[in-house]
Amino acid sequence: MQERVKTKKIFVGDVAIGGDAPISVQSMTFSKTADIGATKAQIDRLALAGCDIVRVAVSDHEDANALKELKRLSPLPLVADIHFRYKLALIAAQSVDCIRINPGNIGSKEKIKAVADACAERGIPIRIGVNGGSLEEMFEQKYGATPRGMVESALYNIKLLEDFGFANIKVSLKASDVERTVLAYRELRPLVEYPFHLGVTEAGTLFHSMIKSSMALGGLLLEGIGDTMRVSITGELEQEVEVARAILKYSGRQKEGVYLISCPTCGRIEADLVSAVKRVEERVKHIRAPLQISVMGCAVNALGEAKHADIAIAFGRGDGLIIKKGEILCKLPEEELVDRLVEEAEKLEREYLEDSFKN
């Protein structure tokens, strides 16, 4: 894994993005923003799921005028998503923590300057949200919907904002496929110092989005690219946050939560491993300590994996071993193994939290 690229640090509300700040997770509500009750309920769900920043669509004046009250109620920093109607950004900038503009449809230089001035007055950032499906006509005609076209759009709009004296910027270059997304971010990275918002747009339902996002976002994170991210899923809000956190964890960019290892099963297994793994997965969701937990169906790989695990199960015939920090802790009947594993994992979390508090 490459060292993370150092970028300029900005703030969306109280959440730092870039520099040495942790990589934050974002999501977006799907209710009509003007329906304050429904939108607040979705924001609360995202906050409970572990989201750091939430974006809301601003499609009309009714949405824009709801932002002041939403900002007052929201437990998370609020980003206004603006397309086409720049005047909505001017209203939104009075309340929210960040404005996202799509350079492909926001309009003329004068309109972008008006948005920049409104954001500068309040000290909030602008995300230049380039989308491969809606490039400005001049870049679409010259480059097509290619990574180069996306990069040129980003550079052009960054230069515009800088010429207006505005440098409180973050950038995204999203396409609906893995290759264009990765190539665009990779090409732009050495050319600018601004933080990157990672994402694959229109990524599809849970299964398809997990594959696309893991490949694109996980690959970029391993290259050291990325400061904040959203996993786009046609599905439940919480899924976006859960998948994003998993990508951060398994790419090594987030040292929090359980890293679960389990074998794929084979003819040697004499226990209901699939059921056991599902029960373990569900019961350790709440653990925030960076623990490695291994659930293995037989002794072939169990002892080797357990050497690297904080706590492990090695199933046998009707019973199994609990292995803690590479040492056999006890042998128990099969039906008691999951309970004991969870109990020991929670002990390890308490020890981790106590040590963290002391330090």
Swiss-Prot record:
Instruction: Answer yes or no on keyword 4Fe-4S.
Output: yes
Q: What class of enzyme is it?
A: oxidoreductase
Concerning Pfam families, the annotation shows:
GcpE
Which positions bind [4Fe-4S] cluster? C263, C266, C298, E305
For this UniProt record, the keywords arranged alphabetically read as follows: 4Fe-4S, Iron, Iron-sulfur, Isoprene biosynthesis, Metal-binding, Oxidoreductase
State a single Gene Ontology molecular function: 4-hydroxy-3-methylbut-2-en-1-yl diphosphate synthase activity (ferredoxin)
Q: Required cofactors, per record?
A: [4Fe-4S] cluster
Query: EC number(s) of the enzyme?
Result: 1.17.7.3
Q: Which InterPro entries match?
A: Dihydropteroate_synth-like_sf, IspG_bac, IspG_bac-typ, NO2/SO3_Rdtase_4Fe4S_sf
How many cofactor units bind, and how?
A: Binds 1 [4Fe-4S] cluster.
Q: Name one GO biological process term.
A: isopentenyl diphosphate biosynthetic process, methylerythritol 4-phosphate pathway
Q: Which reaction does it catalyse?
A: (2E)-4-hydroxy-3-methylbut-2-enyl diphosphate + oxidized [flavodoxin] + H2O + 2 H(+) = 2-C-methyl-D-erythritol 2,4-cyclic diphosphate + reduced [flavodoxin]
Q: Please name the pathway.
A: Isoprenoid biosynthesis; isopentenyl diphosphate biosynthesis via DXP pathway; isopentenyl diphosphate from 1-deoxy-D-xylulose 5-phosphate: step 5/6
Q: Which family does it belong to?
A: Belongs to the IspG family.
The record describes the protein's role as:
Converts 2C-methyl-D-erythritol 2,4-cyclodiphosphate (ME-2,4cPP) into 1-hydroxy-2-methyl-2-(E)-butenyl 4-diphosphate.
Name recorded for this polypeptide: 4-hydroxy-3-methylbut-2-en-1-yl diphosphate synthase (flavodoxin)
Q: What taxonomic lineage is listed for the species of origin?
A: Bacteria, Pseudomonadati, Campylobacterota, Epsilonproteobacteria, Campylobacterales
